[in-house]
Design a protein with these regions (language model features):
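Acidic/glycine-enriched edge-of-secondary-structure segments
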Residues: 22-28, 50-57
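A broad structural signal for alpha-helix termini and local helix breaks/kinks
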Residues: 9, 44, 157-160
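Active-site cores that bind ATP or allylic diphosphates and position pyrophosphate for catalysis
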Residues: 51-398
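Conserved acidic residues
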Residues: 12, 46, 77-78
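Class I S-adenosyl-L-methionine
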Residues: 6, 37-41, 154, 191
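A glycine-rich helix N-cap at a beta->alpha junction
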Residues: 38-52
Length: 398
């Protein structure tokens, strides 16, 4: 993706902003953020930034708003490149503009579909098809990377950002494709392979051979080195922590967490005695209106104490910062450009961040640091390694 982005945009420097230890599907990442940042740097990224956890495990809308606000705040970004199943920027832009405007006809069809029991994604597709009389737009909205791309475009428009968008068409496999292909497989397929490996002290040779056709050598080497030392991590590793949170929360307080509706809160309370694991509970709570990923994100928000009030405060105060996870030593000119042009704080050392941040941004960073410490504690317990706090982690230099 990085090399193709350079070709498409003509850029010679690339800043990657990525989820930290928790990702948008509402689960912990299989590999830690530092391992994945190292991969990105080995494969051509100049600088890797961490998207705060309140955005990284949020809906596509908030995920995109968070990412674009950071990139726009750097003041030195001239292009944004994202992958999409559609690959047609004109089509994605036209849908983004329509959804931003939310004309009366669209809102009417959306509300009608929601009242008829459709989930929000399905209702939005149906409303768009009704309004345009064309199934193509709703087909575009049925693919997750298209949805995220549209949200990036909406966020750029909302911020009146000068950043120029580009999109790369995802080839060979879709986001939800769980089978490996000869040339290029989805992250879901690679994740499935890793999570289905029986307990083993080393990454099995046959799996390494399979993955060598899918991943660059540096990325595969990191997985091999980290295997059974700090990865793989899965949602069920957090089951006991989540069960404690669900049992300790009174019924009336669950709705304060981001994405937890009254309907979902009631289902959690009614079914929490049947809790066996994180994944099992998501499946148990799932309905036609409540998708698995929506439930998974909601439970993660409860676990990490991310509230709706937090999100409103972050949005209302337009608070943001750029936390650097790593950089290439020969691309320090990018760091200088960020320092010279950024309108948001650049965080390199957590211990020195307090004086740079507003109260809301400080809470956002502390929330992210707590979430990473929780992730690290799970790794420490699962693999029997010493705990290393977020304060102790060093910036990766390649």
């Amino acid at each position: 993706h990085i090399e193709k982005a350079k070709e498409l945009t003509g850029a010679d420097r690339v800043i990657v902003i990525m989820s930290g230890d928790y990702v948008q599907r509402g689960t912990p990442a299989v590999l830690s953020k530092h391992s994945r940042a190292h991969m990105a740097l080995l494969n051509g990224a100049s600088v890797v930034l961490e998207l705060p956890v309140c955005y990284s495990c949020a809906s596509a809308e908030f995920f995109a708003k968070g990412a674009v606000s950071v990139l726009d705040g750097l003041g030195c970004i001239d292009a944004l490149c994202f992958g999409s199943e559609c690959g047609n920027l004109e089509h994605l832009t036209s849908i983004a503009h329509l959804l931003s405007a939310e004309p009366e006809t669209y809102r009417h069809h959306l509300q009608s579909s929601l009242k008829n029991g459709m989930s929000f994604p399905a209702a939005r597709c149906h409303a768009l098809e009704k309004m345009t009389g064309d199934a193509y737009a709703s087909q575009i909205l049925s693919d997750p990377n298209n949805i995220l791309g549209i949200e990036y475009l909406k966020a750029l428009k909302e911020l009146n950002s000068p950043i120029v968008p580009f999109t790369l068409k995802r080839e060979f496999s879709g986001y939800h494709d769980t089978e490996l292909h000869d040339c290029s497989s989805s992250a879901s397929a690679i994740r499935k392979v890793l999570m289905n490996i029986p307990a083993s002290p080393y990454l099995p040779k046959n799996i390494s051979a399979q993955l060598s056709e899918q991943l660059p050598p540096g990325s595969l080497s990191i997985i091999q080195n980290e295997w059974n030392f700090s990865c793989p991590v899965e949602a069920d590793d957090f089951s006991l922590l989540l069960k404690y949170r669900l049992l300790s929360e009174p019924h009336e307080s669950l709705c304060k967490y981001q994405d937890v509706s009254e309907e979902l809160s009631n289902r959690i309370i009614r079914n929490r005695n049947q809790f066996r694991s994180f994944g099992q509970f998501c499946t148990l709570l799932k309905t036609k209106e409540l998708t698995y990923s929506r439930i998974s994100r909601s439970l993660l928000h409860i676990l990490l104490s991310i509230t709706t009030e937090d999100m409103h405060a972050y949005q209302d105060n337009s608070c943001s910062y750029a936390r650097i996870l790593g950089f290439r030593k020969e691309h320090t000119d990018v760091l200088r450009a960020m320092k010279d042009h950024a309108s948001i704080p650049i965080i390199t050392k957590l211990g020195k961040s307090a004086s740079l941040l507003s109260p809301e941004a400080s809470r956002m960073l502390n929330q992210t640091s707590f979430a990473s410490d929780l992730y690290e504690s799970v790794i420490s317990d699962k693999f029997g390694i010493p705990f290393t706090s977020e304060q102790q982690k060093q910036i990766i230099r390649v």
